[in-house]
Amino acid sequence: MSKKQGKPEYVTAISNRKARFEYEILDTIEAGIELLGSEVKSVRLGKASLSESYAMIHHGQVWLENMQITPYEHNTLDTLEPKRSRRLLLHKAEIMRLQSKISEKGLTLIPLKAYFNKRGVLKIELGLARGKKLYDKRETIKNRDAKRQLQQLRKQY
């Protein structure tokens, strides 16, 4: 069967693949994000990136920094800056809990995944993370390679 030409392909999730390699994820939390209509359309088309982005708490609000959203090509209004700060929507108690945990040395908020829930609302999965040391990263690579070799051996036999 042939695919319809006029309908665009929608992406269900955008992930930050480097985050789990470079950080040890201690806890995860789901947050909403405040976007404009043209930005939502771009994210639905998969024109967004979470690499090198992070979240910070400023004046009791959580902000997502450096999330790249390419401007929507059919937007007739003025274009927005692709890497502007975007507000994340959390309950005040959750923000206070995150603030107390972030005040510990070495912890940060990293976006792990952006996805649309069942109602079609864009959500960001944040991870409370601690940076890995170089030897931890090497160990991760070693474990990944060992798993890959086991999978290849299983396929052969």
UniProtKB/Swiss-Prot annotation:
Pfam families documented for this protein: SmpB (PF01668)
One MF annotation (Gene Ontology) recorded for this entry: RNA binding
Any one of the GO CC terms: cytosol
Swiss-Prot/TrEMBL keywords: Cytoplasm, RNA-binding
Main location: cytoplasm
Location in the cell: Cytoplasm
UniProt-listed GO biological process terms: trans-translation
Keyword Cytoplasm: yes
Organism superkingdom: Bacteria
CDD domains: SmpB
Keyword Transmembrane annotated: no
Entry's family note: Belongs to the SmpB family.
Function description: Required for rescue of stalled ribosomes mediated by trans-translation. Binds to transfer-messenger RNA (tmRNA), required for stable association of tmRNA with ribosomes. tmRNA and SmpB together mimic tRNA shape, replacing the anticodon stem-loop with SmpB. tmRNA is encoded by the ssrA gene; the 2 termini fold to resemble tRNA(Ala) and it encodes a 'tag peptide', a short internal open reading frame. During trans-translation Ala-aminoacylated tmRNA acts like a tRNA, entering the A-site of stalled ribosomes, displacing the stalled mRNA.
Name this protein carries in UniProt: SsrA-binding protein
Native species: Chlorobaculum tepidum (strain ATCC 49652 / DSM 12025 / NBRC 103806 / TLS) (Chlorobium tepidum)
Gene assigned in the entry: smpB
